């Protein structure tokens, strides 16, 4: 397997952009560009498909370490140390877990925690927020310890007083909890194909239906 260079033509249509098929020959691409410049364009097909993306799962230790590294550059040990310190301060649940779900007996508690987290900056701009707890519950997917979430203690905690690393990690866990309790992201994927001088161009877009 080896990479092969190719060229694409881009067609601007009322603010949208359609992309041509691949040209491996530069001369052929230039010829097609010359032919299409100022030429008539015909829409040959439009397809629409409704798609749904489920909310993300909660953090276990591994996924928390990965995301903290990607966003903040923290090492796995740094993330564990910050999470352990937050656990000892009773702001996060036990961090050494391999589960990304909660148990059914936590449903009422986590609902309260979600509403508390939604009041914290920078999440306090959320309005009309109705969390869905059911998607986070799975008794069979929890062995020794459930997923990492904030605790009820956040109601009286001074988050701004936390050291930067701990504060970043704490807000990251809060953000994941809020995202995990959101409704599915539903959108309509639209694909349109166009013909210009015998060359095919494709434009793709989406229309948000629910988020």
Feature map (PLM): residue ranges:
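Core catalytic DNA strand-manipulation module of type IA topoisomerases
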Residues: 1-211
């Amino acid at each position: 397997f080896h990479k092969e260079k190719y060229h694409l033509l881009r067609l601007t249509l009322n603010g949208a952009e359609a992309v041509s098929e691949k040209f491996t020959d530069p001369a052929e691409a230039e010829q097609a560009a010359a032919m299409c410049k100022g030429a008539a364009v015909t829409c040959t097909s439009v397809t629409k498909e409704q798609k749904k993306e489920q909310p993300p799962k909660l953090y276990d230790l591994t996924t928390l370490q990965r995301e903290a590294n990607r966003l903040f550059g923290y090492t796995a040990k740094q993330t564990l140390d910050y999470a352990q310190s937050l656990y000892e301060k009773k702001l996060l649940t036990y961090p050494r877990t391999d589960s990304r779900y909660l148990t059914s007996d936590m449903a009422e508690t986590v609902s309260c925690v979600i509403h508390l987290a939604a009041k914290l900056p920078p999440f306090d701009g959320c309005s009309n927020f109705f969390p869905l707890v059911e998607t986070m519950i799975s008794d069979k997917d929890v062995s020794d310890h459930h997923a990492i979430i904030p605790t009820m203690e956040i109601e009286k905690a001074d988050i701004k007083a936390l050291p930067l690393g701990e504060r970043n990690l704490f807000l990251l866990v809060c953000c994941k909890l809020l995202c995990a309790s959101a409704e599915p992201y539903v959108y309509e994927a639209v694909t349109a194909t166009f013909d210009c001088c015998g060359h095919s161009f494709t434009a793709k877009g989406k229309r948000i239906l629910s988020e």
